[in-house]
Design a protein with these regions (language model features):
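Acidic/histidine-rich helix-loop elements
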Residues: 67-80, 103-124, 176, 197-216, ...
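N-terminal secretory signal peptides
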Residues: 1-17, 24, 40
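C-terminal helical cap
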Residues: 292, 300-307, 358-369
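Histidine/acidic residue-rich metal-binding segments in metalloenzymes
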Residues: 55, 82-84, 177-191, 209-256, ...
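Conserved, mostly hydrophobic/aromatic
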Residues: 66, 150, 189, 234, ...
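C-terminal segment of N-terminal export signals and the immediately downstream linker at the start
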Residues: 33-67
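Short acidic/histidine-rich active-site segments
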Residues: 296-297, 316-337
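A metal-dependent hydrolase metal-coordination microenvironment
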Residues: 87-180, 208-212, 218-219, 225-226
Length: 374
């Protein structure tokens, strides 16, 4: 028996077919044993639901559009070394957009949330980010993750049953007015970039900071055009509504807002994250570009999370919502990716059809990626 196929009851099975049939059995066993998502009743999901969820994941490429999985929290500078691939395989998650945080060296957390602890020195964040890209390269190679540089790469990884990552950067503070640095990180394998984060930069205003630019700067507009030219998914998470509205006027390709929730979300309930939620109008302008809004996983339960997805779908439509957990930043419902299939299963318990679940779980991001990256 080689690594690509095996015989069973006189039939030839591909590696991918064998993987999915094994996954159905293992997920059903986990459900029977009471294994579930944080704060959920996933153990109550039936083997039939698990099988239906896996069918969705087999027929569509699933994506977490924003994660820090494999790393060590937003303010830690330790190298990323967690076995991200193990959880992805167990939960049948195909793609993770693995976000590095270039402004990490100057961030701190307190009761008010995430703040900057000072002003970076010239070149400090640029040097730090390049070092982090080295670490991510080492981690992905060590754990057998594919690096996806194109939509064809994502499709090939899914067809083979191999987990893959999209290189992602959360905040372009390291550019320091130099567009050539954007081209350099593209050459290093990054395909998804977020304009702003928690540190003031020369691109635009961010939600939790003081407004200094009244939206997008002229350099920010240049950055968006360069993203389109080079082939990046352009992510406007953390940006103020005025910044996003200005970005929409510049953009000629779909924009992504990777991790948030609807402002005043009944499903999410009281939260210290109100400054990062978005209004209905904010969400709609993203959808108007053909883009999508990702919902983070900071909900009380899996059921409430899927309600949060439905809230956003009711505002922007089924083609404009995706999953962006922001995993490894704060506790949430997807503590590790072995539970991903439970999340898809919950989508199928009355809120969404299999086709709709496939769009949210990855199809909508894939549409954006194909257009933006190729």
């Amino acid at each position: 028996m080689d690594c690509c196929s095996m015989h069973c009851h006189g039939h030839l099975f591909t590696r991918r077919q064998w993987m999915w049939s094994t996954a159905v059995a293992s997920v059903a066993a986990m459900l029977g044993g009471g294994v579930g998502l944080h704060g959920s009743t996933a153990a109550a999901q039936t083997a039939e639901t698990a099988s239906a969820a896996l069918e969705v994941l087999r027929n569509s490429i699933s994506v977490d559009v924003h994660t820090h999985g494999g790393t060590t929290g937003i303010t830690s500078q330790a190298p990323p070394n967690d076995d991200l691939a193990k959880g992805m395989r167990a939960g049948s998650l195909a793609i993770a957009c693995l976000a590095d945080v270039p402004d990490r060296p100057i961030l701190k957390t307190n009761e008010a949330g995430v703040l900057t602890a000072g002003t970076p020195q010239p070149g400090q964040l640029y040097k730090y980010h390049l070092n982090r890209l080295d670490w991510v390269d080492e981690m992905t190679a060590h754990h057998g993750l594919r690096r996806a540089l194109s939509a064809a790469d994502l499709e090939a990884a899914h067809a083979a049953g191999d987990p893959a990552i999209v290189g992602d950067v959360e905040g372009l503070d390291f550019l320091e007015g130099k567009l050539e640095r954007l081209e350099e990180v593209h050459q290093r394998g990054v395909r998804h970039v977020q304009l702003v984060h928690y540190t003031p930069n020369d691109i635009g205003d961010f939600q939790t900071g003081t407004v200094t630019h009244q939206g997008l700067t002229s350099f920010g507009a240049e950055v968006i055009r360069a993203c389109h030219r080079l082939g990046f998914v352009c992510d406007v998470a953390h940006a103020t509504e005025d910044t996003v509205k200005a970005a929409v006027k510049v953009a000629t390709k779909p924009l992504l807002l990777s991790h948030t929730a609807l402002s005043g979300s009944p499903a999410m309930g009281p939260t210290p994250l109100t400054g990062r939620q978005i209004s209905r109008e904010h969400a709609r302008v993203i959808a108007e570009t053909g883009g999508a809004v990702g919902i983070w996983h900071f909900f009380p339960s899996i059921e409430r999370y899927v309600d949060g997805l439905k809230e956003m779908v009711d505002v922007v439509g089924i083609d404009h919502v995706c999953v962006g957990t922001d995993q490894q930043v704060n506790p949430g419902i997807v503590q590790d990716y072995s539970k991903w299939v439970h999340l898809v299963g919950e989508m199928l318990t009355g809120r969404f059809t299999p086709d709709e679940a496939g769009k949210i779980a990855g199809g909508n991001y894939m549409r954006i990626f194909r257009t933006a990256v190729g």
